[in-house]
Amino acid sequence: MESGLNNGSIAYPKRLIFLTGCINPDGMAQTKLQNPSLRREQYINSIKFYLDNYNLPILFVENSNSDILEFLPVDIDHRRIELLTFDGNNFDKSLGKGYGEMGIIDHAIRHSHFFNNSDFIFKITGRHQVLNFASVLKQAEKRVSVDIIVDMWNMFSYADSRCWGASRRFIEEVFIHFWKDVDDSRGYNFEDALAKSIYKGLQLDYKLELMKNTPRFKGSSGTENKGFDHSWTSWFPRNAIHVLKYILNRR
């Protein structure tokens, strides 16, 4: 079943917040947070956070065929949000949730009005609220020629997939082609695919910008079902080191 909200009746800004979701993991490997009701509540809170704090269109794509519309506030601004849900979680669960998330992005490429009318997309794990997302937006506004904004670790071998931005062209022409490589059972996850696609993009002259500030996440890890420490005292020293590394890398 395909369901959605918003048929493209408004003008599309060039930037888009894209939230990925899976309300019912249905026994997904390496996913301790399995409770659909709790997951749905977290997705709703996240959607409300971005609607209330950022004047950008929001795309939410969910792959377990679990409709979320009836749970959203009745006064939600439907012109700014597109909701898509589809039956995309029926694959070998040993492949892992990253494989499913790749399928979500592929579904957006093929079916989303918002996605296909945007130039630059910020992909965020749907249950996570990035409390300092304004800093990511500001960086993107200053680096308009950049194709990818991402946080990379371990000598650039690992890319943080919870919050990253990329041009639609990079996502469609490079990134999505790494989908079928994702397989948690052999140790190749979404983050590996993202890092490899970035290296491929650099070879094709796509432009990379490392994220200046470390994202300050509010929410919990689906893998471990543990909450993030989003307190200022925890985030600030980590971010100071992160900004210093960013400055040194640009020299």
Segments from the language model and where they lie:
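ER/Golgi luminal nucleotide-sugar-dependent glycosyltransferases, focusing on the catalytic module
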Residues: 1-251
